[in-house]
Curated annotation (Swiss-Prot):
Residues carrying a glycan: N58, N71, N72, N103, N111, N262, N314, N317, N349, N457
Protein name, UniProt field: Putative myristoylated membrane protein 458R
Lipid positions (N-myristoyl glycine): G2
Family (UniProt): Belongs to the IIV-6 118L/458R family.
Source organism of this protein record: Invertebrate iridescent virus 6 (IIV-6)
Membrane topology: Multi-pass membrane protein
Upper lineage: Viruses, Varidnaviria, Bamfordvirae, Nucleocytoviricota, Megaviricetes
SS bond partners: none
Cellular localization per UniProt: Membrane
Assigned GO CC terms: membrane
TM annotation in the entry: 194-214, 216-236, 469-489
Chain coiled-coil ranges: 150-182
Length: 495
């Protein structure tokens, strides 16, 4: 797992730097030889539309200038956001619970990736004072439009610098060790303690040899065994396992969670602070943290395995790192300028609004063309309004859900609004319907959808009391020695 994380960090940074480099190059409108990054040699008149070229061109790309452009504040901020999302997505499918505190683990991966990226860019600026030559053939005058450039040489240089930066970063090494250890079962000091006990038993108590002090030593050994058993069941290491970006949270009404009782509700500013708060409270066995209210709900009592496993099963990592920050409001009036959010549903007249923000101000616009579609569909289904909005991805459209709008938010700059148009809800017509037409795309809303930040997500966690395995082994060995020794003593007394 450690090697996989190392590879993920390299791929995450390289791909995002490559994409940013391509964006910079592809946005250049170059006149003659005045391009900052690309100098293209041409002869004669006419425009060049260099579309999708890779090697059939005659140009030079200034690596140093490109690296400086990557390093400017706006580009760097955008890169950091993309790297953060890619880094999180890179470990989807990993059971974060086995890594302990997911809040810390995710932040460590993101921060380390950004550090490596910064080092790689600085190295590009310092080391490279060269231009990469490519060839393009053109005769005539005119402008040159560069589009969809993808150069293998740039990719090689970026990959090399990212690898160098990663290999010299101590935080990467720590992450690799952390992920590697998560898959190993490790008992500190186990071998030495068992070995010491065996040596003590055979040498001092005389097992297999001379019986020395058995009348006192072996009863004491049995008492020590009982003490070791007691310590094994009562002396535990208290650790917390957390998960972020969760849909399903702990609730005393959940199946299997009936043994939990509400302990306390407190204000906590961050997900990390919430997990620390529960860990420090000796009565806390599980917690939920709500990012909207900034409150932690702690639970006491017995945490059944069924309850814990059900929460873990429902909080899968398939899409949790890809979620967008989409705020939906509902009300019985149309939204006003001060209403914040991305989408607004007027439940009274069944209208859907979207907020195209300009200059950081709210600007609400109604999807007027869709109002009639929604109303007509609702009337046909015998209701006066649609009931709910759900969110997901277009390729994962659910089964028929009458009276529902489905919002696909998987795209970076727009939403797709689907309506479940079931006109036949009973009988043969429903069974024999064309299921591909259950959902109809009624609108595409162009919005700048922000990615979720880690602290803008709900999280939950459980306390795990881990027994010390070496104590159990000590108890068993002491019990064995005590019983055998007492038996030898009784036999000797009879003789």
């Amino acid at each position: 797992m450690g090697a996989s994380v190392s590879s993920d960090i390299t791929n995450t940074i390289t791909c995002n730097l490559q994409e940013a480099s391509n964006t910079i190059l592809n946005n250049q409108n170059l006149n003659d030889h005045q391009g900052i990054f690309v100098n293209i040699i041409k002869i004669g008149d006419g425009n060049i539309n260099a579309n999708n070229f890779a090697e059939k061109s005659n140009a030079s790309i200034d690596i140093n200038a490109l690296a400086n452009a990557l390093n400017n504040s706006s580009m760097n901020e955008d890169l950091n956001k993309k790297i953060a999302q890619t880094a999180k997505a890179a470990i989807k499918g990993v059971n974060l619970m086995q890594l302990g505190d997911a809040n810390t683990t995710i932040n460590d991966i993101v921060n380390t990736s950004i550090k490596v990226k910064n080092t790689a860019i600085q190295n590009l600026i310092i080391r490279f004072d060269q231009k990469i030559k490519i060839n393009i053939y053109h005769i005539g005058k005119g402008n040159i439009k560069v589009k969809n450039v993808h150069l293998k040489e740039i990719h090689k240089i970026i990959t090399k610098e990212v690898e160098n930066a990663k290999n010299n970063n101590k935080d990467v090494t720590k992450l690799i060790e952390q992920f590697s250890q998560a898959t190993e079962s490790k008992v500190e000091g186990f071998s030495l303690k068992i070995l010491s006990l065996i040596i003590f038993s055979t040498a001092f108590l005389g097992l297999g040899g001379v019986y020395v002090g058995g009348k006192i030593a072996f009863p004491v050994t049995l008492l020590l065994s009982i003490l070791a058993f007691y310590q094994y069941f009562n002396w535990t290491d208290r650790t917390i396992f957390t998960d972020g970006f969760v849909d399903t949270m702990f609730n005393i009404d959940n199946d299997g969670c009936e043994a939990l009782k509400n302990l306390t509700i407190e204000n906590v500013k961050s997900a990390k602070g919430a997990s620390d708060r529960c860990l420090k409270n000796p009565k806390c066995v599980a917690y939920n943290w709500n990012h909207n209210t900034k409150k932690i709900t702690m639970f006491k009592g017995v945490l059944e395995e069924g309850c814990k496993n059900d929460i873990l099963k429902n909080n899968t990592n398939e899409t949790l790192f890809e979620r967008k920050k989409l705020i939906v409001r509902e009300g019985k009036k149309d939204p006003i300028m001060s209403t914040n959010g991305d989408l607004y549903l007027n439940n009274k007249n069944q209208t859907l609004w979207y907020n195209y923000k300009k200059k950081k101000q709210n600007n609400w616009k109604e999807l007027k063309n869709e109002k009639k579609i929604i109303l007509d569909n609702s009337i046909k289904q015998g209701i006066d309004k649609f009931i709910k909005i759900i969110f997901g991805y277009e390729e994962k459209l659910p089964g028929p859900m009458p009276h529902t709008l489905y919002i696909d938010y998987s795209h970076n700059n727009h939403l797709k609004v689907f309506l479940c148009k079931l006109n036949f809800l009973i009988g043969k017509d429903f069974k024999n319907r064309d299921q591909s037409k259950d959902w109809t795309l009624i609108s595409t809303i162009h919005l700048d959808i922000k990615m979720l930040d880690f602290e803008e997500n709900d999280s939950c966690g459980v306390i795990v009391e881990q027994n010390k395995l070496w104590l159990l082994c000590v108890a068993v060995i002491l019990l064995f020695i005590g019983i055998i020794g007492m038996g030898l003593g009784l036999k000797k007394n009879k003789n």
